[in-house]
Amino acid sequence: MKLPNILLTGTPGVGKTTLGKELASRSGLKYVNVGDLAREGHLYDGYDEEYGCPILDEDRVVDELEPQMTEGGVIVDYHGCDFFPERWFHIVFVLRTDNGILYKRLETRGYHEKKLQDNIQCEIFQVLYEEAMASYKEEIVHQLPSNEPEQLEDNINQISKWIEQWVKDHNP
C-alpha cells in the first residue's frame, strides 16, 4: 500500500514535535525528527559558536532519509525545508504560533536572548512559510495555527482526514 510523506515545518517552539508524534501514533505513519536523527547519527558539519549548536550536514541527512522517503509513510519534523528534495513530500504543513505565546515557549526552553529574538523575527516575517512556498508547489503548502491545545486536536483531525483521502486516492 502506498502511503504519503508529510513535512511539518515552522519556527522552533511552534509544536511540530508534539503534532508529529501524536499524528504518527494515530495514523501509523513513521515519525522522524531531523534534529534527533542528526544527533544520533552525528550528521553534523561543524559547530555554530554564536548560537551554541551544531551545524547540520544537510547532504548526509538527505542520504540518511532517502530510503525511508522512497518507501513512503513518513512524517518529517524540522524547522527548515529548503534542502529536502521536492519529490519527497506529498503535503507540507507550516505551523504558526502567535509571537507572545512563542516567546514564552522558547523562554521556557532556556533560549538565550539573541536566539529568542532571531526565532521571533523568523516567525514575524514568515521566513519558514516563505521558504516552504519557494521550495514546494504552492498547492501542497498549508499553514496551521498552533497556539492552543484545542488547535492541536483540530490539526490532527484535519491531517488525518487528508491522509485517509490520500490513501484512498492512491491505492485503487
Curated annotation (Swiss-Prot):
GO terms for biological process: ribosomal small subunit biogenesis; rRNA processing. The gene is Ak6. Belongs to the adenylate kinase family. AK6 subfamily. Broad-specificity nucleoside monophosphate (NMP) kinase that catalyzes the reversible transfer of the terminal phosphate group between nucleoside triphosphates and monophosphates. Also has ATPase activity. Involved in the late cytoplasmic maturation steps of the 40S ribosomal particles, specifically 18S rRNA maturation. While NMP activity is not required for ribosome maturation, ATPase activity is. Associates transiently with small ribosomal subunit protein uS11. ATP hydrolysis breaks the interaction with uS11. This is Adenylate kinase isoenzyme 6. Gene3D superfamilies: P-loop containing nucleotide triphosphate hydrolases. Its EC number is 2.7.4.3. One of its GO terms (molecular function) is adenylate kinase activity. One of its GO terms (cellular component) is cytoplasm. InterPro entries: Adenyl_kinase_AK6 (IPR020618), P-loop_NTPase (IPR027417). ATP binds at residues 13, 15-18, 109. The keyword Kinase applies. It comes from the Eukaryota. It is an enzyme of class 2 (transferase). It comes from Rattus norvegicus. Residues 108-118 are annotated as: LID. Residues 33-56 are annotated as: NMPbind. The keyword Nucleus applies. It is found in: Cytoplasm; Nucleus, Nucleoplasm; Nucleus, Cajal body. Monomer and homodimer. Interacts with small ribosomal subunit protein uS11. Not a structural component of 43S pre-ribosomes, but transiently interacts with them by binding to uS11. Interacts with COIL (via C-terminus). Its main location: cytoplasm. It catalyses: AMP + ATP = 2 ADP; ATP + H2O = ADP + phosphate + H(+). Keywords: ATP-binding, Cytoplasm, Kinase, Nucleotide-binding, Nucleus, Ribosome biogenesis, rRNA processing, Transferase.
